[in-house]
A protein has these predicted regions:
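Short hydrophobic beta-strand element within catalytic cores of glycosyltransferases
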Residues: 97-101
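A conserved mid-protein helix/loop that constitutes part of the nucleotide-sugar donor-binding site
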Residues: 1-21, 31, 38-44, 86
Length: 171
């Protein structure tokens, strides 16, 4: 899954192209993209061109993303740049495995490649698809360990501590 405004910054066209490549050998995965924006029609067209209408779903704007997070396995951030990457923290706190572009501001501060998530080179052909395949090759213990380390790293940031407290109160 991925979350964000459907804008050039979020680079969802790259995500859809890479997911299409990945899906050729992995038919059981689906991609849900939450958000709305000016690139919606362009992305719908790309999904049709790639014949991915049954695998990639543009959900639109959602008030409670945690309902989607709790039913997902992986969070992918494909942004060209990010300020400051709160969505990565939300995904990590939601117990998702995080795969992110190595874009400026956010991901590299939160993720340590291979220790608490995976980073890929943005717009590099097959790099995201290879990262998803890397995730699949991990054992359940490795996935659990990496997600736990990500939560621990996120907890260092005070704003995320407050987010956890609010989440407990309102859950």
């Amino acid at each position: 899954m991925s979350i964000g405004r459907l804008t050039k910054q979020k680079n969802f066209s790259y995500l859809i192209n890479e997911f299409s490549t990945f899906s050729k050998n992995n038919e059981d995965f689906l991609l849900y993209i939450l958000g709305d924006g000016e690139e919606k029609n362009k992305l719908i067209k790309l999904i049709k061109e790639k014949d991915m209408e049954k695998k990639v779903f543009l959900i639109g704007r959602v008030n409670n993303v945690f309902n989607y997070i709790k039913n997902s396995e992986i969070f992918i951030l494909s942004s060209l740049w990010e300020d400051p990457g709160f969505v990565l923290a939300e995904a990590g706190l939601g117990n998702l495995f995080v795969i992110s572009s190595d874009c400026p501001n956010g991901p590299k501060e939160i993720l340590d490649y291979g220790k608490n998530g995976l980073l890929f080179k943005n717009n590099q052909k097959n790099d995201l698809a290879n990262s998803i395949n890397k995730y699949i090759s991990l054992t359940e213990n490795e996935k659990f360990s990496m997600k736990s380390k990500l939560k621990k790293n996120i907890s260092k940031y005070s704003i995320f501590k407050h987010n956890q407290i609010f989440k407990r109160i309102f859950s």
